[in-house]
Amino acid sequence: MAAASLWVQLFLALGWTVYVIYLPALAAQAGLPKAMVPWLLLLDQAIFAAMDWALGTMADRMAGAMERLANAILLATLVSCGAFLMLPFVAPAGSPALLVAVTVVWSATSSALRAPPLALIGRHVPGPSQPWAAGLFMLGLGIAGAVAPYLTIALKEADPRLPFALSAVALAAATAFMTRAIRANPQPATPMASVSTPVRGRPVAMFLLAVALLGLGFQVHFALNAAPGFLRLAKPEDLPYLMPVFWIGFNLLILPASLATKRYGGPAMMAIGAAAGGLAAAVVANAGSLGVLVVAQFFAGAAWGCVMMSALAAALAMGRTGREGFVAGALWALLAVAAFTRIALVIAQVPQQPAWKPLLGWAPGAMWLAAGLLLAGAATASRRAATDPRTP
């Protein structure tokens, strides 16, 4: 199940990349002005935020009917893939409303492939193996991030119908394989009655606040600062080969770091990864040579891989058992809110304003370090809650 989720996340993320590459052209075909494209991306993130949390909670309510949940995930995915496949065909019809409607259907149903599969991993993968499973889950996203710049170059002049069709078919096939694995293992790894009470209250609140800070820090560091940072020291034609450095670090460390998460716990390793990422982001912001910048970006990506894998493992542990989908859905929703905020800043042209540039330079490091302190507190609170049932 965990291995299948790697492929699901890979094809889901690659589909998003294909969508972003072709959205300006599709919007123009549908009669939407170019200025509306960022607003469509903003709408997507708002839908992700709402649906990720809602579907995660739904997965908790269906905890006793795994086969029914598997069927629901597959059905939602088939609807999502169908809508995605239709996008390059409905755009030439020249109807902005139709393009937006199909996009909304795709965005809403694709959320079935984030929190619900994680909830299933939380129930069906034994606790000690969950960090490794979380690493596999996130590795698919990391691989997609690494190949995205090359995909942008390769698809620049291609007919959009073929990439959309290949992405939709690949995602549907991977999801069918994953849901088959769910049906083959319908019983939880640990009986419900023998598992400790979920950790609620202060540790979860501190964890989610840290996730919000980490998500915002990542959006500023990679989506806003990375390309301009490289262009300070490198040629524009080298950018597609430099941007994947972050994701190479992410992919190389994510599975080895899961071994440390297994031993020390998700919040503790998130705190370590956040602190390391904050320091690496500070070096990136002040790098005076391309070599230093590349090395710092590599370590920033490695730290982010540790953070994200540990965050998923921590969400599953905090939600155990019966609330895995709720906590995992909240995590994904907050990451979508972070992306929403970044797109809103771009629409407002904040990154182009000279007064904001120094703030954007040091903000990722500051937010990641602050999140590290919060997570250290969350780890302490979690240990107290595990030993004292009176802890809120």
Sequence positions of predicted segments:
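A late C-terminal transmembrane helix in Major Facilitator Superfamily
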Residues: 322-352
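Hydrophobic core of transmembrane alpha-helices in multi-pass small-molecule transporters
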Residues: 83-90, 94-113, 292-306
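Helix-to-loop junctions at the C-terminal end of transmembrane segments
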Residues: 50-67, 156, 253-266
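Intracellular juxtamembrane helix-capping segments at the cytosolic ends
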Residues: 112-125, 306-320
